[in-house]
């Protein structure tokens, strides 16, 4: 079963299934390592869930909730 990345709390590990965007934002996410099959750890979620601190490929990255919502993931 898949969900959007913005629905997860700290401590979850998920795998990217699909990214639902295109253009500049898609290139930005791909450049940061957000590619299908990559594993993401949700490290911390700020108040109101915005932004989220994520760990991907041993890098810590913060994404806005609106950006995280575009990433479809599955729990691993």
PLM segments and residue spans:
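Short, structured beta-strand/loop micro-motifs enriched in basic residues and often containing a Trp
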Residues: 12-26
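Ubiquitin-like/PB1-type beta-grasp interaction modules and other compact soluble beta-rich domains
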Residues: 2-7, 51
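Short alpha-helix capping/helix-loop boundary micro-motifs
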Residues: 2, 25-28
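C-terminal structural segments of small proteins and small subunits
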Residues: 48-76
């Amino acid at each position: 079963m898949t969900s959007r990345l913005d629905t997860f709390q700290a401590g979850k590990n998920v795998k990217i299934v699909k990214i639902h965007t295109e253009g500049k934002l898609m290139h930005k996410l791909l450049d940061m390592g957000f590619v299908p099959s990559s594993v993401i750890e949700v490290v911390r979620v700020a108040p109101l869930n915005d932004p989220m601190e994520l760990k991907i490929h041993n890098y810590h990255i913060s994404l806005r909730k609106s950006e995280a919502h575009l990433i479809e993931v599955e729990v691993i």
